[in-house]
Amino acid sequence: VYKRQDNARTPMQWNHQEHAGFTTGTPWLSVNGNYKEINVENSRKNPDSLFSYYKTLIALRKNNDVLIYGKFQLLDKEHPEIFAYERTLDGKKIVVICNFTDHETQMEATEDLTDGKILIHNQGQNRLGKEKWILGAYEAWMIEIG
C-alpha cells in the first residue's frame, strides 16, 4: 500500500510574495509560514546561504581537474567520525576533511595543511594543524596543496 507524501511537502518558496511566488492561484498544499524569510530569492542574494555554498562547490568541481580526474585516496579508513580524503593529479593535491557528527572531533594529521590554500569551508576557525586536525560539529574543509 502506497501512502501519499503530501504531509512531507510544501510548495517551493521562490520569494516573499503571496503563496511564496509558487503560484498565482490557490496552492493544493499550504505554504510554510517562514516563506518571507526563507526563499530562493533571499538565498541567491546571501553569500552565506546553503544555495551559495553549493554554487561554490559546483564551480570548484567544474573548474578543477584534480576534483574531476584526480586519484582518490581515503586518509583514515578506520576513523569513525571524520571522512577525509585526497585527490591528486599532475603534482596537485586537494584534501577534503568532513566531520558528520554533532560534536567536535579530531584525527591525526596525515600532512601539514597550514600553508595550503583554503578553497572552501563551511564554518569555524582553521584548526588543521601539523599534528592533528580538529573539526567542530558538521565542519568541512577543502584545501589545495601545491
Outline where the language-model segments fall:
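Carbohydrate-interacting/catalytic domains
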Residues: K3-G146
